[in-house]
């Protein structure tokens, strides 16, 4: 349940005056190199490949710090010279898991011609050094010939439809983007459908037919086609010539028709622009959408005009609206619940507004200056994995003499935020924040920030999303993790050695914790440990799965031991050890302390929906005043509702003695 606006405002006011935080945190782009990148999620992390490096493989546990495993081939395979005799390298890999193996579809081509071919290589395991790792080339899949074909066999991308069939999109210029059906077993073109479907094409004379790099993904029963438009690959001294951008459309069938948000067919020149040049980030394109546990992400390259002027990659969330259209979220800079405002979708009412500026004290070294004019707007699409009450930690600078005001709209709900002077412009110490209460949905959320001119102004750096915990953390609200997944019933599953991340957990909203319980099924041994800050951080709560009591519906309740006085804002890591197979976890439940009043029962359990009032604090944490409770001095059995991930309750009758 929501805690109510009064409760959230209470926490916000308490922090606004006294907040200190465990550590300053400034985002920093990792500048991972890559061109035409492809990524895949596997159980222990991520794999990444890109163009012109003989299918060089990188792996990462967190999609931020990457390990180079070198090239997976020594050069162009011999078969490829039959179709592209003058090819000079391997382009545009696409990593996809099908038929029990990891396959990399790649292409060879003669630049500027249609003498091109697509082939693939495969391995059972994608982690070097593990059992089953080792690449085998399977040769030719599809080809085109210059002077004969009006499309080009490059830039392959594989997708699985809702019926279990596999398809491969490809193409560049000419007739644009094509689609063929694949045989899942062989990996080659299917024998039961030899059609080459034209699914996207630039038709205007001005465009020159410049469309390539298709990527397909299914979401909520519809198919999304992302393509790259315009001029690519000019970098270094020629970076200003690059006009590359990312467009998309969607369809109800994998074979199309794909239409943009305005209803125009992509096969007739349509397409909605998702990403194009902004600030230092030139030519964001050549990307691929992929499924990452509980979110869809998009990896693409760009050229850094303020740095080395060469290619690097960004990984972003794709954020879907309620009517299932895609918007592009933040580049991933190491955290899931933070948004750098300079990476938002910027609408300028006048030229010179919303200027991306540099500062050594700004997160990632950049911020938005001149947030001045009514009608200018910053839109931040965000994927949120746990629905509920949040505080938006609004990091700003106001070098004026009086407070500025901004309009903050969260999923259509507007509020006005006051931003007092901070003493200087362009500097952003961690104390220069205000807290904005908001209720967020699970899935796509859309935050819009606008100046509300009153003659005073404020610059913006970053928004952090802090989740307020009343009595429950749902396991399936995790931000990411290793050796974890969501089942078809949306339940959280974890294997031995796995962990899940819960960022920015506000623990000050918990008061007088009596017991902590974890809902579990499908496991009777091993331990779940909740840790502070990292996967091997200090243990906060330990839940021994061998000590459980049956709740019903297959669920058991495990009583956890640990620090019942936990406070502050924490990143919590849920870690698993000693588990056989896979454990299904429900909610982590914080039960209020059971106390007595005059040796007699005094009333009802404290409700998770009760509001709270702020209490002054000098400790740097948020202090919450005791909640008022109703009491009638009668022995009345109260019912404590335990809920599984589907919201079904397993009621356990208990008796409370409440002190007030």
Residue ranges and their predicted role:
Residues 1-23:
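Bacterial Sec-dependent N-terminal signal peptides
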Residues 273, 412-442, 535-569:
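Extracellular carbohydrate recognition and processing domains
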Residues 400-401, 522-525, 636-638:
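Short proline/glycine-enriched turn/loop motifs at strand-loop junctions of beta-rich domains
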Residues 390, 443-445, 568-570, 657:
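Exposed beta-strand face motif in extracellular beta-rich ectodomains
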Residues 403-414, 526-535:
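Short, surface-exposed beta-strand/strand-loop-strand elements in extracellular ectodomains
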Residues 359-377, 385, 424-428, 487-501, ...:
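Extracellular beta-rich ligand/substrate-recognition surface
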Residues 21-355, 359, 393, 462-529, ...:
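Carbohydrate-active catalytic/glycan-binding domains of CAZyme proteins
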Residues 612-660:
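C-terminal outer-membrane/trafficking sorting elements
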């Amino acid at each position: 349940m929501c805690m109510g606006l009064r409760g959230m405002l209470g926490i916000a006011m308490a922090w606004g005056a006294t907040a200190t935080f465990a550590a300053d945190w400034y985002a920093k782009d990792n500048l991972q190199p890559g061109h035409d990148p492809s990524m895949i999620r596997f159980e222990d992390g991520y794999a990444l490949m890109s163009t012109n490096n003989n299918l060089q493989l990188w792996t990462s546990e967190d999609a931020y710090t990457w390990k180079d495993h070198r090239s997976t081939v020594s050069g162009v395979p011999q078969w490829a010279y039959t179709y592209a005799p003058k090819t000079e390298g391997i382009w545009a890999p696409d990593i996809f898991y099908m038929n029990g193996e990891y396959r990399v579809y790649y292409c060879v081509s003669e630049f500027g011609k249609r003498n091109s071919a697509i082939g693939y290589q495969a391995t059972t395991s994608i982690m070097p050094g593990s059992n089953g790792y080792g690449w085998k080339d399977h040769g030719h899949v599809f080809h085109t010939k210059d002077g004969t074909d009006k499309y080009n066999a490059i830039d392959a991308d594989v997708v699985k439809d809702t019926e279990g069939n596999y398809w491969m999109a490809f193409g560049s210029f000419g007739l644009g983007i094509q689609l063929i059906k694949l045989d899942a077993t062989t990996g080659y073109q299917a024998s039961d459908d030899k059609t080459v479907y034209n699914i996207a094409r630039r038709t205007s004379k001005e465009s020159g037919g410049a469309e390539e790099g298709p990527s397909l993904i299914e979401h909520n029963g519809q198919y999304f086609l992302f393509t790259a438009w315009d001029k690519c690959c000019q970098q270094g001294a020629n970076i200003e010539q690059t006009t590359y951008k990312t467009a998309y459309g969607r369809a109800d069938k994998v074979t199309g028709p794909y239409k943009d948000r305005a209803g125009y067919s992509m096969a007739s020149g349509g397409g909605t622009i998702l990403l194009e040049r902004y600030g230092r980030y030139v030519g964001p394109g050549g990307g691929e959408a992929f499924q990452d546990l509980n979110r869809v992400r998009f990896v693409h390259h760009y050229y850094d005009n303020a740095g080395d002027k060469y290619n690097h990659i960004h990984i972003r969330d794709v954020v879907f609206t309620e009517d299932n259209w895609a918007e592009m979220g933040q580049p991933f800079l190491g955290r899931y619940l933070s948004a750098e405002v300079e990476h938002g979708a910027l609408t300028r009412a006048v030229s010179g507004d919303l200027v991306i500026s540099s500062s050594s004290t700004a997160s990632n070294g950049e911020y938005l200056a001149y947030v001045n004019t009514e009608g200018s707007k910053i839109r931040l699409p965000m994927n949120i994995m746990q629905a509920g009450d949040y505080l938006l930690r609004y990091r700003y600078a106001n070098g004026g003499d009086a407070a500025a005001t901004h309009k903050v709209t969260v999923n259509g709900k507007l509020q006005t935020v006051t931003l007092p002077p901070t003493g200087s412009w362009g500097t952003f110490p961690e104390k220069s924040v205000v807290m904005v209460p908001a209720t967020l949905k699970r899935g796509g959320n859309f935050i819009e920030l606008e100046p509300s001119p009153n003659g005073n102004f404020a610059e913006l750096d970053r928004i952090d999303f802090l989740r307020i915990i009343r009595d429950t953390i749902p396991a399936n609200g995790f931000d990411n993790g290793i050796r974890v997944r969501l089942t078809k019933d949306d339940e959280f599953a974890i294997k031995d050695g796995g962990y899940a991340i819960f960022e920015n957990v506000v623990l000050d909203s918990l008061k007088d914790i009596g017991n902590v319980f974890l809902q579990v099924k499908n496991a009777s041994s091993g331990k779940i440990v909740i840790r502070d800050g990292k996967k091997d951080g200090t243990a906060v709560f330990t839940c021994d799965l061998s000590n459980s009591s049956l709740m019903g519906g297959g669920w058991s309740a495990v009583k956890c031991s640990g620090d019942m006085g936990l406070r502050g804002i924490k990143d919590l890591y849920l870690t698993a050890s000693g588990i056989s197979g896979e454990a299904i976890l429900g909610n982590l439940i914080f039960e209020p302390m059971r106390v007595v009043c005059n040796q007699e029962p005094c009333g009802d359990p404290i409700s998770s929906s009760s509001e709270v009032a702020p209490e002054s604090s000098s400790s740097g944490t948020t202090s919450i005043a005791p909640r008022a409770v109703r009491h009638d001095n009668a022995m009345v059995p109260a019912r404590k509702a335990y809920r599984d991930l589907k919201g079904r309750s397993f009621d356990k009758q208990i008796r409370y003695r409440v002190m007030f």
